[in-house]
């Protein structure tokens, strides 16, 4: 839904637009919008915050929740046989011919935060040049719904999320 609204605003006001979406929105109810925006090569930048849980609605399992990760709706952990594998949105969108730039970063330590800032800047730069659809996936902690202290949440992200969701550029047509 964010992407449809963004396209409308961009078209009407002739401005660059971006969306800031969580995994519950983008990887669940908004999957159709993100896939088709990438397929159309929309000149929109998306900042996709992946904390592997529905953080704003009570800590339910999201499409990005890791196998074995406990949530309010999966108290014994996500079961891959029952719920499928966690969705790797960046890898999926990198395969779309009209996507221009896709990168996954994390904000769990200072060096990664610096890399995240550079990736977001690059996405916006490509958008301002009219290159097409860009997305930066940001792996982020959710200490409250993970039931962890902020420090433990950063460690959990490093030990569990980054191995499943490897950091790095997934597609960069500007570098080809």
Annotated model-derived regions:
Residues 1-13:
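Single conserved hydrophobic/aromatic residue that forms the stacking wall/gate
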Residues 10-14, 35-43, 95:
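Alpha-helix C-terminal capping segments
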Residues 14-29, 44-49:
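A short, small-residue-rich loop immediately preceding and capping a beta-strand
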Residues 26-27, 51-56, 143:
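Short gly/pro/ser/thr-enriched loop/turn and capping motifs at secondary-structure boundaries
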Residues 31-36, 56-70:
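Active-site-proximal loop->helix
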Residues 41-63:
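A short, conserved beta-to-alpha structural element at the edge of catalytic cores
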Residues 62-129:
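Conserved thiamine diphosphate
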Residues 128-176:
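Flexible, low-complexity linker and terminal segments
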């Amino acid at each position: 839904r964010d992407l449809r609204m963004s396209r409308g605003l961009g078209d009407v006001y002739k401005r660059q637009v971006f969306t800031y979406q969580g995994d519950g929105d983008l990887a669940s109810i908004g999957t159709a919008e993100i896939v088709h925006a990438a397929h159309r090569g929309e000149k929109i930048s998306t900042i996709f915050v992946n904390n592997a849980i529905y953080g704003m609605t009570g800590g339910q399992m999201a499409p990005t929740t890791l196998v074995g990760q406990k949530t309010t709706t999966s108290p014994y952990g996500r079961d891959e046989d029952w719920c499928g594998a966690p969705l790797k949105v960046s890898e999926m969108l990198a395969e779309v011919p009209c996507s221009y730039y896709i990168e996954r970063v994390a904000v769990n330590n200072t060096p990664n935060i610096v890399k995240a800032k550079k990736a977001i800047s690059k996405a916006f730069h490509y958008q301002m040049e009219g290159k097409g659809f860009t997305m930066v996936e940001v792996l982020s902690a959710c200490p409250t719904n993970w039931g962890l202290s902020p420090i433990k949440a950063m460690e959990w992200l490093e030990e569990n999320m980054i191995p499943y969701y490897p950091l790095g550029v997934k597609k960069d047509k500007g570098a080809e």
